[in-house]
Design a protein with these regions (language model features):
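Terminal processing/anchoring signals of secreted or surface-associated proteins
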Residues: 205-207, 218-221, 253, 274, ...
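Short loop/turn microsegments at loop-to-beta-strand junctions
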Residues: 30, 133, 243-245, 272, ...
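Carboxylate-rich, polar loop motifs that coordinate divalent cations or form catalytic acidic clusters
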Residues: 1-216, 255
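Short, glycine-anchored, charge-dense loop/turn motifs used at functional sites
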Residues: 244-256, 289
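Glycine-centered coil/turn sites that cap beta-strands in beta-rich domains
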Residues: 212-247, 259, 274, 297
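Short, conserved beta-strand segments of beta-strand-rich sandwich/propeller modules, principally
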Residues: 188-190, 285-290
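C-terminal tail/sorting-segment detector
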Residues: 288-310
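Glycine-centered tight-turn motifs at strand-turn-strand junctions
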Residues: 256-284, 296-298
Length: 310
């Protein structure tokens, strides 16, 4: 970015775009830049809100703290992230907000980012409150990871409504509660936390959704008494597609377990984690169990077996 120019390098040449219509004051500097699923560029600034730009038609819009024109909590934006639903998550020096309709950013007359409202012992409050949100990452299951200035890491489901875990120096190996950057390896499920006192990695056991349902397997197998969970996943580096229906039956054909790989039932993305419990919540007996899988429209199926040894 120049003073009011956006520069793109592609195929060995530079292209310049005038973004003065977004009224940026770039003397404050930039904090983050991302591209969403519509190829819209979102630019976070350190004092002038967010600039949205799409080179298709040279469309541009500046988003500020003004109601109906962004509704940001503060003009100083530190972090941006786009998820699989094309929602834009924005971390500022005073809280977190999200644009749920990023696709309409250039057409909407009224466009306000919204905080995520959660219930804390029955009392509504904003997710992360007024924390400074330094970094935001999205994993392979569309779950969210938020790194803050003083509060460590908050890990939520895709909508942000349910907190899966909180990590701090008191309850985890992270060396500091000041999180500078979070990065996710979507292939392995590892999440890397960069703090002001060092870097640590966490194995989230989350996999991205696959494109098609092929050969699957379960591990560990056989499953012994000291194994707490069984993972059902695709072979050869593939993962289960979103919406896959998974049924586990005993040898008599009785349904023991059923779960779709969707938000609200499984948060591991393109694989299923079974805790060896049946639909009544009790641990299953020793024996052979058959796993039946079908994709969302039942056009693809697969099967495997699990041996339980208690």
């Amino acid at each position: 970015l120049g003073k009011k120019e956006l520069k793109k390098f592609s195929n060995g040449s530079w292209t310049e775009f005038n973004i003065s219509a977004g009224k940026p004051n770039l003397s404050f500097g930039l904090s983050d830049i991302i591209i969403d699923r519509n190829n819209t560029l979102w630019i976070g600034t350190r004092g002038d809100g967010v600039i949205a730009f799409n080179e298709n038609g040279n469309r541009i819009k500046g988003l500020t703290t003004t109601p109906t024109q962004g509704g940001l909590p503060k003009m100083r934006v530190l972090s941006l992230a786009s998820d699989t639903e094309n929602r834009i998550w924005i971390g500022t020096i005073s809280g977190l907000v999200v644009f749920n309709n990023a696709s309409g950013v250039f057409d909407a007359d009224v466009l306000d980012a919204q905080p995520i409202i959660i219930l804390d012992d029955g009392t509504p409050r904003k997710l992360l409150g007024d924390e400074t949100v330094n970094t935001i990452a999205v994993d392979g299951a569309n779950n969210k990871w938020f790194g803050t200035e003083n509060g460590g890491v908050t890990y939520t489901n895709p909508s942000g409504q349910n907190t899966i875990a909180n990590f701090s120096k008191q309850n985890s190996p992270i060396p500091s509660d000041r999180i500078v950057k979070i990065a996710v390896d979507k292939d392995t499920g590892k999440v890397f936390f960069a703090t002001d006192k060092g870097i640590v990695a966490y194995n989230s056991n989350v996999a991205p959704f696959g494109d098609s349902l092929g050969e699957v397997y379960a591990y560990p197998n056989p499953v012994r008494k000291f194994h707490d969970i069984v993972t059902i996943d695709g072979r050869n580096g593939t993962n289960l597609p979103k919406g896959t229906n998974v049924k586990i039956l005993d040898v008599a054909g009785n349904l023991v377990y059923e779960s779709n790989v969707v938000e609200g039932q499984q948060l591991q993305g393109g694989k299923v984690i079974w805790d060896k419990k049946n639909l009544a919540g009790t641990y299953v007996a020793s024996g052979i169990y058959v796993v039946l899988l079908a994709n969302e429209d039942a056009s693809e199926t697969s099967t495997t077996k699990i041996a339980i040894i208690n």
